[in-house]
């Protein structure tokens, strides 16, 4: 059986594509860089992949606001193809700036109800924190559900998840869209700096209603090996990133293999 093919979407300013590429490869997938210009020129097609990942960075220099230019370019050259990809049930994952991109594209929720905005601290937050899985998402359930807190690095200035009202937040929970929450070593907490940006309800990661479009602010690809972790986590057999990417490739192999 061929390894699952994972497209890594790029444009000028993305800068975490290499870490994502090698994380996918080390976990048994077949990664491929897909520049937005390759899609526009017809050299590569969204439909060729089993999963898509939009990596972190500062796409288009984050001019106007984080992720909006990359989102506009993707919608212009492959809007229908990406919608069809998502409707097929295949995973689309946005990490940090990639999360901002897919939020701008409206792939997780309505933009007038749900947004990523400036950190409460008013500055770029770059540190380690922890996340705890809070949904029953089948892609990551076996590795993360009910197994405590997992160390992850964050690095962003516009990572605060905000909702337009209590009804929107309630609907996210009803639809099981809250994938991970910020935590300390004891469990979910809203306290800074563990919640580095002030996200509502300490939410670190969201999905669409079907669970296959996934956005997260932490960077699992930056903690693939235990030696990249800090404190007691450096002595764990498997780091968070390996668990994350192993889960993705295992899911793809079972469902779309």
From Swiss-Prot:
Predominant subcellular localization, coarse grouping: cytoplasm
Superkingdom of origin organism: Archaea
CDD domains, per the entry: GATase1_FGAR_AT (cd01740)
Catalytic site positions: 96 (nucleophile), 219, 221
Pathway: Purine metabolism; IMP biosynthesis via de novo pathway; 5-amino-1-(5-phospho-D-ribosyl)imidazole from N(2)-formyl-N(1)-(5-phospho-D-ribosyl)glycinamide: step 1/2
SUPFAM superfamilies referenced in this protein's UniProt entry, alphabetically: Class I glutamine amidotransferase-like (SSF52317)
EC number: 6.3.5.3, 3.5.1.2
Subcellular location: Cytoplasm
Protein task: Part of the phosphoribosylformylglycinamidine synthase complex involved in the purines biosynthetic pathway. Catalyzes the ATP-dependent conversion of formylglycinamide ribonucleotide (FGAR) and glutamine to yield formylglycinamidine ribonucleotide (FGAM) and glutamate. The FGAM synthase complex is composed of three subunits. PurQ produces an ammonia molecule by converting glutamine to glutamate. PurL transfers the ammonia molecule to FGAR to form FGAM in an ATP-dependent manner.
Subunit structure: Part of the FGAM synthase complex composed of 1 PurL, 1 PurQ and 2 PurS subunits.
Name assigned to this protein: Phosphoribosylformylglycinamidine synthase subunit PurQ
Organism annotation: Thermoplasma acidophilum (strain ATCC 25905 / DSM 1728 / JCM 9062 / NBRC 15155 / AMRC-C165)
Name of the coding gene: purQ
């Amino acid at each position: 059986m061929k390894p699952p093919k994972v497209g890594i979407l790029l444009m000028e300013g993305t800068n975490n594509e290499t870490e994502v590429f090698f994380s996918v490869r080390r976990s048994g997938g077949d990664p491929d860089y897909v520049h937005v210009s390759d899609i526009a020129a017809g050299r590569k097609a969204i439909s060729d992949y089993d999963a898509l990942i939009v990596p972190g960075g500062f796409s288009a220099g984050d001019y106007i606001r984080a992720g909006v230019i990359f989102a506009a370019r993707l919608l212009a050259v492959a809007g229908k193809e990406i919608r069809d990809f998502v409707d097929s049930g295949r995973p689309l994952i946005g990490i940090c700036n990639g999360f901002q991109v897919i939020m701008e594209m409206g792939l997780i929720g309505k933009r007038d109800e749900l947004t990523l905005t400036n950190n409460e601290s008013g500055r770029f937050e770059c540190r380690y924190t922890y996340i705890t899985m809070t949904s029953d998402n089948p892609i990551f359930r076996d590795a993360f559900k009910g197994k405590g807190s997992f160390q992850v690095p964050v690095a962003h200035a516009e990572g605060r998840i905000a909702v337009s009202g209590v009804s929107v937040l309630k609907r996210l929970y009803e639809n099981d869209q809250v994938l991970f929450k910020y935590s300390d070593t004891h469990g979910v907490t809203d306290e800074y700096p563990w919640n580095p940006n002030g996200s509502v309800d300490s939410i670190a990661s969201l999905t669409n209603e079907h669970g296959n479009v996934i956005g997260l602010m932490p960077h699992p690809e930056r903690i693939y090996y235990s030696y990249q972790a800090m404190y007691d986590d450096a002595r764990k057999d498997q780091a968070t990133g390996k668990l994350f990417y192993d889960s993705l490739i295992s899911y793809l192999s079972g469902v779309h293999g």
